[in-house]
Curated annotation (Swiss-Prot):
Top-rank EC class of the record's enzyme: ligase
Gene3D superfamilies: Bira Bifunctional Protein, Domain 2, Serine-tRNA synthetase, tRNA binding domain
Family: Belongs to the class-II aminoacyl-tRNA synthetase family. Type-1 seryl-tRNA synthetase subfamily.
Keywords linked to the UniProt accession: Aminoacyl-tRNA synthetase, ATP-binding, Cytoplasm, Ligase, Nucleotide-binding, Protein biosynthesis
Protein name listed in UniProt: Serine--tRNA ligase
Organism of derivation: Mesorhizobium japonicum (strain LMG 29417 / CECT 9101 / MAFF 303099)
Annotated L-serine binding sites: T239, A240, E241, E293, S393
Location, primary (coarse class): cytoplasm
Length: 434
């Protein structure tokens, strides 16, 4: 959530930021004008309430003076005034809550402001290559896509998955099931033992306010799955970013404890409401998938350096797996709602003859912290400031499995197991059809 004081002082800058995110000039200007009007109405009302409270306090003292001087008529008149003010304040406090909610609701649908060095663009075609790692091999005529290989091995079953759950689900078996588990364990071990992340096993169902904190709600409600719980509901996490980031919600962290670095391997659940017709075959876009998430909580001075570090941690996964990839700087029009800057890591898939996203690493500034009320103590201990939050995939496990299958496939239909995964698979070197 953006700072209303910043908006008040920089309305033109916000209009320009929204335009960079592909808002029309008219929509951006009217939105900012509406926000400022809501803010002014709230501030005027609060000022009026404060004036009434001051008058009530003064009148209460005057009642005592009138009683002591024997002026009963004045005392009664003042008592009536105090009673009227009390009623006004009670109604006014309810109105203040309404104005607060209206302002918060308006702020909640505004995206974050991109950093100055983010390339301006409309969509993925305007993203910029940061660097390329690994050589893309010449495509052989026998190369297949992951689902063709998996089905031929008898270890990837989409038909039975559809019988169980419908479309966009997969049943993995035998060697491929074992390799997906190995990939997740390898990633966790790398991030915890070498990259300094603390492993967490979080809840997979969370409250609405937690989803609001990491900006899934209200904007992306249709992408989520919910289950009834008591008189309300719980949402299934679309990413472990949600519970990991919210670990610091409504807390004040000591400065010397920062940065906090968390990682988790969890299933993720997404309705893929906006993805009809995209990647309908295979495992690329699923309702349920495993992902290793990286989350960092930093002070306001360290977040940009932490963003570079986090991205390098995610890239290291692909380097160890010896998979070709490229890292992209997302343009303003393709960047996520809560991000100030995002790097997408795209792994090479020979079967598709294309790079596909496997990780997205974003720095959010204090955007999520304001929604969560997550702060830290200043170095001097005199004040509290909002933390900065970062999140990234370290990486998507299912997509890493896809990349391994396609890049390590052999002409006979077998899949060579990357060296780094073999200790997790009992020394096995190859997956073959039974």
């Amino acid at each position: 959530m953006l700072d209303i004081k910043w908006i008040r002082d920089n309305p033109k800058a916000l209009v320009e930021a929204l335009a960079k995110r592909s808002w029309s000039a008219g929509e951006a200007q009217s939105t900012v004008d509406d926000l400022i009007a809501r803010d002014e109405a709230r501030r005027e009302h609060v000022t009026e309430l404060q004036t009434k409270q001051e008058r009530r306090n003064a009148a209460s003292k005057e009642i005592g003076n009138a009683m002591r001087s024997g002026d009963a008529a004045l005392a009664e008149k003042l008592k009536a005034e105090v009673g009227d003010i009390k009623t006004f304040i009670q109604n006014g406090e309810a109105r203040e809550r309404e104005l607060d909610k209206a302002l918060t609701d308006a702020l909640a649908v505004l995206p974050n402001v991109p950093l100055d060095d983010v390339p301006v663009g409309k969509d993925e075609h305007d993203n910029v290559v940061k660097h390329i790692v690994g050589k893309v091999p010449t495509r052989s005529n026998w190369v297949k896509e992951h689902f063709e290989i998996g089905e031929a091995l008898g270890m990837m079953d989409f038909e039975r998955a559809a019988k169980l759950s419908g479309s966009r689900f997969t049943v993995l078996k035998s060697g491929l099931a074992r390799m997906e588990r190995a990939i997740g364990q390898f990633m966790l071990d790398l991030h915890t033992t070498e990259h300094g992340y603390e492993e967490v096993i979080p809840p997979l169902m969370v409250r609405d306010e937690v989803l609001f904190g990491t900006n899934q709600l209200p904007k992306f409600e249709e992408d989520l799955f919910f289950t009834p719980h008591g008189e309300g509901r719980l949402g299934l996490i679309p990413t472990a970013e949600v519970p990991l980031t919210n670990l610091v919600r409504e807390e004040i962290t000591a400065h010397e404890k920062l940065p906090l670095r968390f990682t988790a391997l969890t299933p993720c659940f997404r309705s893929e409401a906006g993805s009809a017709g995209r990647d309908t075959r295979g495992m690329l876009r699923q309702h349920q998938f495993y992902k290793v998430e990286l989350v960092s909580i930093t002070d306001q001075d360290s977040s940009l350096a932490e963003h570079e570090r986090m991205t390098q941690c995610a890239e290291e996964v692909l380097k160890r797996l010896e998979l070709p990839f490229r890292t992209m700087v997302l343009c303003t029009g393709d960047m996520g709602f809560g991000a100030r800057k995002t790097y997408d890591i795209e792994v090479w898939l020979p079967g598709q003859n294309a790079y596909r996203e496997i990780s997205s690493c974003s720095v959010c500034g204090d955007f999520q912290a304001r929604r969560m009320d997550a702060r830290y103590k200043d170095k001097d201990g005199k004040g509290n400031r909002f933390v900065h939050t970062l999140n990234g995939s370290g990486t998507a496990v299912g997509r890493a499995l896809i990349a391994v299958i396609e890049n390590y496939q052999n002409e006979d239909g077998s899949v060579t197991i990357p060296e780094v995964l073999r200790p997790y698979m009992g020394g096995l070197a190859k997956i073959e059809a039974k």
